[in-house]
């Protein structure tokens, strides 16, 4: 009797535990796979969390050598504010004062400017050299500097003697000092300089239409004919406005020149 009761109790216990066993044990029940429990909590893996960030490589700055062969050339509106009268040349207030502005605008356009620290017209006066010898006077100083490092551009800045009507441009309610590019054809490699001058002239005109008066290629019959441009294949002379241009007009134009230099020399668009 006792054994029969034990068998009955065991049978009922088995029936009670059977559903639990079917859940806990991964077996085939009624021909259907019992899926394993899947953890839906997110798991962070270092390899997956770190996103690939593209590296932006900055191009090397354009190396520019800046000089002023006619270092005492002046602008009437600017010099008059200082000395009270108009003057075409002044030993203190002159075109060399634009060097800080040029450096500033060029730095904003990934260009590093070295200024040739030489007051050419002052030294010419000391040695009693005539005006027409200005390029010969500065040549050894320029040559020495060019030997120190390679330059992508040698920029000789001048002020034209032309009047306001010729050297000024009105564009979008702002006035700009117009510029002219001068290339000396009195040496065998002038075509290289001319190509860069033409590229720069075209680029500034894209930024501000008609701001460039064009490229003037001159032989010795037209003037100096070389302008020390035989010392570098990327040497350019720029006439920055004229005697009647203002500080504001010059500043706006320098911003345009700096941008054009950046485009032409970084993309090497001179042809």
Model-assigned labels for residue ranges:
Residues 20-65, 73, 86, 271:
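N-terminal, intrinsically disordered, polar/charged segments of Gram-positive cell-envelope systems
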Residues 74-76, 123-127, 162-167, 190-192, ...:
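Extracytoplasmic/secreted cell-surface and envelope-processing proteins
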Residues 141-184:
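Active-site microenvironments of hydrolase-like enzyme catalytic domains
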Residues 191-217:
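Active-site-adjacent substrate-binding region
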């Amino acid at each position: 009797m006792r054994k029969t009761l034990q068998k009955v109790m065991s049978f009922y216990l088995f029936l009670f535990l059977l559903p639990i066993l079917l859940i806990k044990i991964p077996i085939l029940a009624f021909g259907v796979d019992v899926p394993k429990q899947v953890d839906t909590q997110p798991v962070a893996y270092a390899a997956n969390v770190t996103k690939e960030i593209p590296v932006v490589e900055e191009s090397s700055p354009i190396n520019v050598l800046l000089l002023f062969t006619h270092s005492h050339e002046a602008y009437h509106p600017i010099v008059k504010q200082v000395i009270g009268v108009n003057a075409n040349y002044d030993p203190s207030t002159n075109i060399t004062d634009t060097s800080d502005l040029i450096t500033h605008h060029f730095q904003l356009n990934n260009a590093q400017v070295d200024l040739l620290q030489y007051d050419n017209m002052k030294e010419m006066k000391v040695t009693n050299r005539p005006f027409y010898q200005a390029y010969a006077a500065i040549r050894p100083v320029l040559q020495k500097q060019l030997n120190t490092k390679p330059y992508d551009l040698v920029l000789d800045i001048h002020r034209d003697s032309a009047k306001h009507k010729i050297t000024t441009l009105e564009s979008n309610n702002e006035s700009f000092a117009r510029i002219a590019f001068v290339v000396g054809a009195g040496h065998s490699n002038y075509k290289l300089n001319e190509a860069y001058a033409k590229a720069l002239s075209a680029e500034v005109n894209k930024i501000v239409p008609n701001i460039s008066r064009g490229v003037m290629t001159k032989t010795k019959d037209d003037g100096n004919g070389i302008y020390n441009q035989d010392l570098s294949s990327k040497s350019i002379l720029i006439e920055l406005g004229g005697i009647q241009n203002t500080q504001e007009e010059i500043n706006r134009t320098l911003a345009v020149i700096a941008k054009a230099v950046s485009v032409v020399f970084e993309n090497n668009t001179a042809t």
